[in-house]
Amino acid sequence: MSLLSVQLYSVRDAFAADPADTLRRLAAIGFTQVEPYGVVENVEALRAGLAANGLTAPTAHARLIGADQPAVFAAAAELGIGLVIDPLVKPEQWQDPADIAATADALNAAAKVAAEHDVQVGYHNHWWELESRIDGRAAFEVFADQLDPAVALEVDTYWATAGGEDAAALLGRLGDRVKAIHVKDGGLATDATGQLPAGQGQLPIAAVLAAAPAALRVVEFDAFDGDLFEAIAASHTFLTGDRR
């Protein structure tokens, strides 16, 4: 199975306008897997578009805390998605140990609901979970310590680096709890400006990939000043070593 995927949020405008064509273009680049967002609202478009283009979606992003979790997990199961990842919890919830514990408890509870649908739960970081420190440790690692083993992690290596962490070292500490990583590059600005295809920015991509050799590698752009499909194709070329 390929270890390469792409987050559909990267091409959210194109996907909203024409999901079928967007998935076709990503498949033409060479992707066989995608990471959707908003599985409930996009379930019909994804059901048709994935099948038509020979794509699968092993992971997806969807808000879980405070959401209609049975509906999310039912849609995920219908689409063959095995891991549903909560994409963010707001920065103010990462400053106090009690708030961090509450977030961990909420995802641990969500994992029990997900299991009824044969789906797993995960969490995806931004920079603020790493920037915030609790007794000298990154809030993200304090949080990870409190998760049930059934809850996976998707480490956004760009945001972790922007938050002040050595992403490769972080991956090493978290170990096989990391089931997926987001791979992007650029100047590490927290406002998402200056993002670049993999291998063209400041992130030590080779070290990051070596630190999580079995994790799904999900290409993502929060923003890009140019043609997003060309940028995604450049990342695909870099990550596959296809220099044709």
Short names for language-model regions:
Residues 5-17, 59-66, 94-98:
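Active-site mouth loops of central-metabolism enzymes
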Residues 38-49, 93-95, 99:
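Active-site-adjacent beta->alpha loops and helix N-cap segments on the catalytic face
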Residues 33, 65-152, 173:
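Active-site acidic/histidine proton-transfer and metal-coordination neighborhood
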Residues 34-40, 61-65, 154-157:
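Catalytic beta/alpha-barrel core
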Residues 47-62, 108-110, 114, 141-148, ...:
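Alpha-helix-loop-beta-strand connector modules within alpha/beta enzyme cores
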Residues 57-59, 85-86, 123, 155, ...:
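Hydrophobic residues in well-ordered beta-strands that form the structural core
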Residues 1-28, 40-43, 77-82, 117, ...:
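Histidine-acidic metal/acid-base catalytic patches
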Residues 26-33, 51-57, 150-153:
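Short, surface-exposed connector motifs at secondary-structure boundaries
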